[in-house]
Regions:
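Cytosolic regulatory regions of ion transport systems
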Residues: 1-456
Length: 456
């Protein structure tokens, strides 16, 4: 597909890399000459130095025959303007990143009036993810499928869970838990396990289950399941605003620490149910005086990654509450993986994942389309949900007879109101949603899960 990408910041760079690696013809547009030249030299993309809201620049980029137009500059208004001009000048799908909370209640109106195909608000998405984690504090990561009915949950295995030396196939009968272990991180590597795989203390385990079955499983292995009742948030940006709204709607007591007096006053007016403290959140004595040791959750949301990391490490030393850390710079994820920071949230990953998911779905106008895509475990694993629109080599055949690719696990089938953890005798049918976890990147269609070389 021909894609025009306006904006070459962190998200734009991640998109240029991912989309070009998947074989798309990507043209990057930005006013920053150095950034454009860097992307041209680093990835297989074209580049134009210019304003993405200029019809002349858009024409030079080939807007007339573009399939997708993506605007991820640092300005919401510029992103919307670029998309509006792109829709007028071409016949493409337009995607905009819009971050300002003042637009949050107007997104549907904006999409309809301008004709934008999709709008992504990374701060709102991050707030929703953090809210899920605080409602299920035993998990370090939660992704949702099937409209929220199915969850992919990650946790750290310790001696307290009593699963050291247990084979995965023994878990359902041993714990009476209908869950499926999908991936295990061990010694720096990632394994897509089979039933004979034996768990060890220290493993980072990712499993799939319904919310009810996940809750029951965590109870069986002595993991915390009660939602937090209070939250101490350091940093009063957009994520803190959205998160506070989510938490207060669920009757969680919220305290926000914001060092900027004007912003603290603004938050106090916008969030009358929250306690807003105009203080320096990096002041350790202040945090202790505000009850850090008894807080059920601590969320570091400042604009400085290093400060968030240090704050979380300090909170870990003094609190047994749920810890959540926001990180913006994607290149630090391998370093952070070695630190015990609780749950780490990457808003920029969410933006990139959403847009890549949308582009992949557009490629498959017929057949089995991607409905949901997550890149998990430090971008080493993809979890995908496909909608089955037509019969293929993957449908109507017992799963035990399908020749699946290596390092791929078919985890779940949703059929109407039914959620199936599949067994060998189950079959994929037209109308199903199918969830797979794989080490292979770039799957576009359900048929891609089959090992063509192994078919007889």
């Amino acid at each position: 597909m021909k894609i025009i990408l306006v904006g070459s910041g962190k998200v734009g760079t991640a998109l240029a890399r991912q989309l070009s690696e998947e074989g798309h013809n990507v043209t990057v547009v930005d006013t920053n000459k150095a950034r454009v030249e860097h992307l041209i030299e680093t990835y297989d993309v074209l580049g134009i130095v210019g304003n993405g809201s200029s019809i002349t620049t858009l024409s030079e980029a080939g807007i007339e025959d573009a399939d997708v137009f993506i605007a991820v500059t640092g300005s919401d208004e510029l992103n919307l303007l670029c998309c509006m001009f792109a829709k007028k000048a071409g016949h493409c799908h337009a995607i905009a990143r819009v971050r300002n909370p003042s637009y949050s209640h107007e997104l549907d109106f904006i999409k309809k009036q301008i004709g934008i195909s999709a709008i992504i608000n990374p701060e709102m998405a991050a707030a929703k993810e953090i809210s899920h984690l605080l409602r299920f504090p035993g998990a370090s990561k939660i992704d949702t499928f099937a409209g929220g009915r199915v969850r992919l949950i990650k946790f750290a295995l310790t001696e307290a869970q009593g699963l050291d030396g247990v084979a995965i196939r023994e878990i359902p009968s041993r714990l009476k838990s209908d869950i499926l272990v999908c991936a295990v991180e061990r010694d720096g590597g990632v394994i897509i396990p089979n039933g004979n795989f034996v768990l060890q203390n220290g493993d980072q385990v990712t499993f799939l289950a319904t919310q009810e079955n996940a809750h029951a499983f965590f109870q069986q292995i002595h993991m915390p399941v009660r939602p937090v009742r209070n939250a101490l948030i350091v940093g009063g940006g957009a994520i803190a605003f959205y998160l506070s709204q989510e938490l207060m709607d669920n009757h969680v007591r919220v305290r926000i620490v914001e060092r900027d007096a004007a912003r603290a006053q603004e938050l106090a007016e916008q969030l009358p149910g929250a306690q807003v403290l105009n203080e320096d959140g990096s002041n350790r004595d202040f945090l202790l005086s505000e009850g850090l040791e008894s807080a059920e959750s601590f969320v570091a949301l400042t604009n400085i990654d290093e400060e968030n990391v240090l704050l979380t490490l300090f909170a870990k030393k003094h609190s047994h509450g749920k810890l959540v850390t926001k990180v913006n710079r994607l290149e630090f994820d391998d370093i952070l993986a070695g630190l015990d920071l609780g749950s780490v949230v990457y808003p920029k990953y969410m933006t990139c994942d959403y847009i890549v998911q949308y582009v992949r779905a557009l490629q498959n106008e017929a057949g089995s389309n991607i409905k949901t895509l997550y890149r998990i475990l430090d971008d080493r694993v993809e979890a995908l949900e496909f909608t089955v629109h037509e019969e293929s080599a993957a449908t109507g055949v017992p799963l035990s007879q399908l020749h699946l690719k290596k390092n791929l696990l078919l985890c779940c089938i949703t059929r109407g109101d039914r959620i199936l953890i599949p067994r060998g005798g189950d079959q994929i049918q037209v109308g199903d949603n199918v969830i797979v976890v794989t080490l292979e990147h770039g799957l576009h269609d359900l048929r891609d899960i089959l090992d063509k070389g192994a078919e007889g």
